[in-house]
Amino acid sequence: RVCSRYEITKCDVLMFFDYPADKKTLDIILEKAQPKKVHFMSYEPKVMDEAEFLKTFTGMVKFAAHNMGGKIDLVRCAGFLGKSIEVFQRLLDLYEEVGFLTVTDRNNAFYIIDFKGIDDLSKVLHSTKYAEIFDMIVECEAFQRSLLEDDLAEVLL
């Protein structure tokens, strides 16, 4: 039986094909699934340069604005780009701050936005808030690498 992070149920064996971006996400999944065994399949963490990451995320924002009624699913963003939900919450708040969009509704699962347009991504790249977000991105990548390289018995405690 295959399930996604939307519908985690108890199971005997849990297999990760995409690694969680942070310990919090891993712990939530383990708590809900309560597996007897955990397998981490071979995985290459998504590591993008800043411009590529923002370009991809911006494309996701535009898609949501034009095709999803402005609804941005945070779990979907996190899963697709391999970063924590908090990264995307902070990015959307920053995009609003620089005038790219207006957030009309928000909760832990999704944001609904009114897209204004993106004229210059350097407004984001040169922001001190983006530097903090980038540090979070680096932490996500380091956590995913730790799942590949470290003793999993220690990580899973």
Each language-model region and where it sits:
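A short, well-structured beta->alpha microelement
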Residues: 1-10
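A short beta-strand element within the Helicase C-terminal
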Residues: 10-16
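Conserved segment of the helicase C-terminal RecA-like domain
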Residues: 30-51
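Short amphipathic alpha-helical interface segments
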Residues: 52-72, 76-79
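C-terminal accessory/interaction regions of large nucleic acid-associated machines
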Residues: 78-80, 87, 104
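Short amphipathic alpha-helical interaction segments
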Residues: 82-97
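A short, conserved structural fragment
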Residues: 96-109
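Short, amphipathic alpha-helical interaction segments positioned at domain boundaries
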Residues: 116-156
